[in-house]
From Swiss-Prot:
It comes from the Eukaryota. Changing residue 201 to W: Reduces catalytic activity 7-fold. Changing residue 135 to Q: Loss of catalytic activity. Introduced by genetic manipulation and expressed in canola by Monsanto (Calgene) so as to obtain laurate-rich seeds. It comes from Umbellularia californica. It is an enzyme of class 3 (hydrolase). This is Dodecanoyl-[acyl-carrier-protein] hydrolase, chloroplastic. It is found in: Plastid, Chloroplast.
Length: 382
């Protein structure tokens, strides 16, 4: 053991010290004797006693012996260190690693769940999951060489002032990851009719391979100058067509038709919602996830405390600009925290034009953190 070896080294050092004369000095050594002709005759006073220069040299410690003892101590410590049971740290998944599968058509990227992405129940939110998918979308386009001047625009799209806008998104969540987990996002694109592009996602637990989230979205082209929808030019189709695959993460029959709300049918209403400068992307377009945040403005906190979103459908009807003022409306079906809930949502401009319709389905959380909440409180409409 390290203790035994070090103790032996210290005993050796002690023996060296005891071998010196009674004054703690080393014995007289012939190699330190000075020639009589060269020996100085002057005497020096040390603590009131006169000593010659030759005698002073005799009183110096034997540094070679001390150095040998110190070397022995360090050698013993180093030997014991190499004998310890040392194991290399397990290799972590390569975070933020981009790679492809299915002959280069399925893009994969891993994400570590950060502390700022989890809530009071220690799980991620639907917004954090959608942020990961949005980041994978842009890196997918960049990796296959179809990323132009803007986010998600190809070179031919940039020449024609075109950009992709999301028309519909559906997310189905089986389980939310927690802080410290690592997830892998898979995404791929395919055709949707004559003028649409479909993008599908699978989010997996890197440790177990379990599918946590499935998502599909439909995008169409919009002219950045006229802000009107456009057909897909042949040149653009030639850029993105080779990356299309015929596979879906969510079937169309899983997506239910959305209901229209108005002031008389909504349970919760909030107005005065406006986009800010940091809500815009490089295309001067309000980020899609900002619409989701506005939808949640009229969802009671009690629902977030007792339920998770199990599915989420969004239909974008109109673009809002930086000067827009919006209203968020929500109606809730069901009233017990022990059963599933369904919420219908609407975002509209202050003038009444629809911006977005949405539907969220909620399932009870498995934790007991909020067991005290039994019913969803009625709140007055504003």
């Amino acid at each position: 053991m390290a203790t035994t070896s070090l103790a032996s080294a210290f005993c050796s050092m002690k023996a060296v010290m005891l071998a010196r004369d009674g004054r703690g000095m080393k014995p007289r050594s012939s190699d330190l004797q000075l020639r009589a002709g060269n020996a100085p005759t002057s005497l020096k006073m040390i603590n009131g006693t006169k000593f010659s220069y030759t005698e002073s040299l005799k009183r110096l410690p034997d540094w070679s012996m001390l150095f040998a003892v110190i070397t022995t101590i360090f050698s013993a410590a180093e030997k014991q260190w190499t004998n310890l049971e040392w194991k290399p740290k397990p290799k972590l998944p390569q975070l933020l690693d981009d790679h492809f599968g299915l002959h280069g058509l399925v893009f994969r990227r891993t994400f570590a769940i950060r502390s700022y992405e989890v809530g009071p129940d220690r799980s991620t939110s639907i917004l954090a999951v959608m942020n990961h998918m949005q980041e994978a979308t842009l890196n997918h386009a960049k990796s296959v060489g179809i990323l132009g001047d803007g986010f998600g625009t190809t070179l031919e799209m940039s020449k024609r002032d075109l950009m992709w806008v999301v028309r519909r998104t559906h997310v189905a969540v089986e389980r939310y990851p927690t802080w410290g987990d690592t997830v892998e996002v898979e995404c791929w694109i395919g055709a949707s009719g004559n003028n649409g592009m479909r993008r599908d996602f699978l989010v997996r637990d890197c440790k177990t391979g379990e599918i946590l989230t499935r998502c599909t979205s439909l995008s169409v082209l919009m002219n950045t100058r006229t802000r009107r929808l456009s057909t897909i030019p042949d040149e653009v189709r030639g850029e993105i067509g080779p990356a299309f695959i015929d596979n879906v993460a969510v079937k169309d029959d899983e997506i239910k038709k959305l209901q229209k709300l108005n002031d008389s049918t909504a349970d919760y209403i909030q107005g005065g919602l406006t986009p800010r400068w940091n809500d815009l992307d490089v295309n001067q377009h309000v980020n899609n996830l900002k619409y989701v945040a506005w939808v949640f403005e009229t969802v009671p906190d009690s629902i977030f405390e007792s339920h998770h979103i199990s599915s989420f459908t969004l239909e974008y009807r109109r673009e809002c600009t930086r000067d827009s003022v919006l209203r968020s409306l929500t109606t809730v079906s069901g009233g017990s925290s022990e059963a599933g809930l369904v919420c219908d949502h609407l975002l509209q401009l202050e003038g009444g034009s629809e911006v977005l319709r949405a539907r969220t389905e909620w399932r009870p959380k498995l934790t007991d953190s909020f067991r005290g909440i039994s019913v969803i409180p009625a709140e007055p409409r504003v």
